[in-house]
Regions:
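Structural signature of beta-strand start/N-cap positions in the alpha/beta core
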Residues: 10-13, 70, 90, 110
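Short, glycine/polar-rich helix-capping loops at beta-to-alpha or helix-loop-helix junctions
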Residues: 96-106
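Catalytic-core regions built around general acid/base machinery
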Residues: 2-11
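Short acidic-hydrophobic, aromatic-tinged amphipathic segments that line or gate anion-handling sites
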Residues: 111-115
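Short amphipathic alpha-helix with an adjacent loop that forms part of the alpha/beta core around
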Residues: 119-125
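Substrate-recognition "cap/lid" segment bordering the active-site pocket of phosphatases
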Residues: 15, 21-73, 78-87, 101-103
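Short secondary-structure boundary segments
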Residues: 19, 95-97, 116
Length: 125
C-alpha cells in the first residue's frame, strides 16, 4: 500500500490486470487497497481473452490515455511476464508473489526485484 500511495502522490497512475473473475478482483482490491485510486481494475471479463493475451493492457492504456512506453508492468508470474511481452511494455517481475524466481527468469523480464521499494528506483531513474 505504501508503494502505491507514493506512486500516486507523485502523480503516476496505477491499474490492476488480473485473471480472477471481475467481481472477485474488484472485491479484493476494495478490501486490500481501499484508499488507492486505481485508473482501472480489470479481472476476467466476458468476451475478453485472459492474460497472457495483451487485450487487458491495451484496455488500460486507452483508459489511462498513455502509450506503451510509459508503462511498467509489475507482476508475480510467468503469465504476467508473457502479457508484458505480448503488449510490448516494460516488464518487472516480483519475487514476493506466488511463483518462484526461476519462472520469472524464464521470460527474461526487463527487471526482477525483491522489494516493493525497488519499483520506485526503476520508475524514477
Amino acid at each position: 500500500t505504501e508503494l502505491l500511495d507514493e506512486l500516486q502522490a507523485k502523480g503516476l497512475q496505477v491499474a490492476v490486470a488480473s485473471n480472477k473473475y471481475q467481481a472477485a478482483t474488484e472485491k479484493l482490491i476494495a478490501h486490500y487497497f481501499p484508499n488507492i485510486r486505481f485508473t482501472a481494475v480489470f479481472g476476467q471479463r466476458e468476451g475478453v481473452n485472459v492474460k497472457p493475451d495483451p487485450t487487458v493492457v491495451y484496455d488500460i492504456l486507452k483508459i489511462a490515455q498513455i502509450s506503451k512506453e510509459d508503462v511498467l508492468y509489475v507482476g508475480d508470474s510467468g503469465v504476467d511476464m508473457q502479457t508484458a511481452i505480448h503488449a510490448e511494455v516494460t516488464s518487472c517481475g516480483v519475487t514476493w508473489g506466488f511463483r518462484p524466481r526461476a519462472e520469472l527468469e524464464t521470460f527474461h523480464p526487463n527487471y526482477i526485484i525483491d522489494k516493493a521499494e525497488e519499483v520506485l528506483e526503476i520508475v524514477f531513474r
